[in-house]
Regions:
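Active-site-adjacent loop and "lid" segments of alpha/beta metabolic enzymes
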Residues: 1-6, 13, 30-44, 63-88, ...
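Glycine-rich, aromatic-flanked loop segments that form ligand/cofactor-binding clefts
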Residues: 16-19
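Enzymes and membrane/adaptor proteins characterized by extended Gly/Ser/Thr/Asp/Glu-rich
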Residues: 26-28
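Catalytic domains of carbohydrate-active enzymes, especially glycoside hydrolases
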Residues: 43-59, 253
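Phosphate/pyrophosphate-binding loops at sites that engage ATP/ADP/AMP, CoA/4′-phosphopantetheine
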Residues: 49-50, 54, 89, 170-183
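Short glycine-rich or small-residue beta-strand-to-loop segments that form or flank ligand, phosphate
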Residues: 189-191
Length: 279
């Protein structure tokens, strides 16, 4: 396993760690990110690592709006050989497993994954005990509803305070079980049961949604449908500029990890911004 501790917080220059997305699914919302073989995944992952990825996030179930769930056996079948191959090739790179199921997370951790990226924020009651026992980090994300129905007219009074309240409840469950705050990272869940106005408010709030000082903040905005509403970009392949525009805010919002499809472009952005700050 990698030494994930320094990878949970921002870089020394204040910019976030970069997490590259590896979708081992046939139906993820961004077609170019769909991977189906170990060889293809290793090729893409190698490019990501060479371009500066700190983390590789492996998912075997699509969570795009309207996506149907797959069973745990199929999810494990998809991700296990990939994680094994990634761990062998990249011993020092952080590997996270994107799953809602404790049984899948456990199998991934056994194979060498370092962190659990749980978009359902502990919907599986066995997840808490797993995280406590393994003493591994976890990302908990806010989502209103399920992927198949989350975008059906989501409503909030004050989206920032409501998201923080839910995350606080989940964090308290973990803390009560003995999980250390620095093992926990929160994600506002951009595009998961939110309209454009909700997404913008949450991005603007930055780390204000995080209930504990020692916790981290992760953003996942890469090529999401909010750029269709914001910029009129209906095709996912046309949303890179919008993704980079949001990423440029990450340092000022104290983001620790940013989850992206386009590692090289985000690393170049942060390098350019860091260089300009020195003048």
């Amino acid at each position: 396993m990698a030494d994930w501790r320094p990878l949970m917080v921002r870089r020394d220059d204040g910019f976030p760690r970069i997490m590259g997305v590896l979708n081992i699914t046939p139906d993820s919302f961004y077609a170019d990110s769909r991977l189906s073989s170990i060889e293809e995944t290793l090729k893409i992952a190698t490019t990501m690592v060479e371009n500066g990825a700190d983390w590789l996030d492996v998912g075997g179930e699509s969570t795009r709006p309207g996506a149907k769930a797959v069973d745990s056996d199929e999810e494990i079948k998809r991700i296990l050989p990939i994680i094994s191959a990634l761990r062998n090739k990249f011993p020092d790179v952080g590997i996270s497993i994107d799953t809602r199921r404790a049984i899948v997370a456990e199998a991934a951790l056994d194979e060498g994954a370092d962190m659990v990226n749980d978009i359902s924020a502990l919907s599986d009651p066995k997840m808490v005990e797993l995280i406590k026992t393994r003493d591994c980090p976890i990302c908990i994300m806010h989502m209103r509803g399920l992927p198949e129905n989350m975008q059906h007219n989501p409503e909030y009074g004050d989206v920032v305070s409501e998201v923080k309240k839910i995350l606080s409840q989940k964090v308290n469950i973990l803390i009560s079980a003995g999980v250390k705050p620095e093992r926990i990272i929160g994600d506002p869940g951009i595009g998961f049961g939110k309209l454009l106005e909700h997404n913008i408010k949450l991005l603007s709030a930055g780390k204000k949604i995080i209930p504990l000082e020692k916790m981290g903040l992760m953003w996942g905005v890469s090529r999401k449908s909010m750029f269709s509403d914001l910029l009129g970009r209906k095709k996912t392949e046309d949303r890179l500029a919008g993704s980079l525009g949001i990423a440029a805010m990450a340092k000022s919002r104290a983001v620790d990890i940013i989850r992206v499809h386009d590692v090289a472009e985000h690393r170049d952005l942060f390098r350019a911004m860091s260089t300009l700050e020195d003048f």
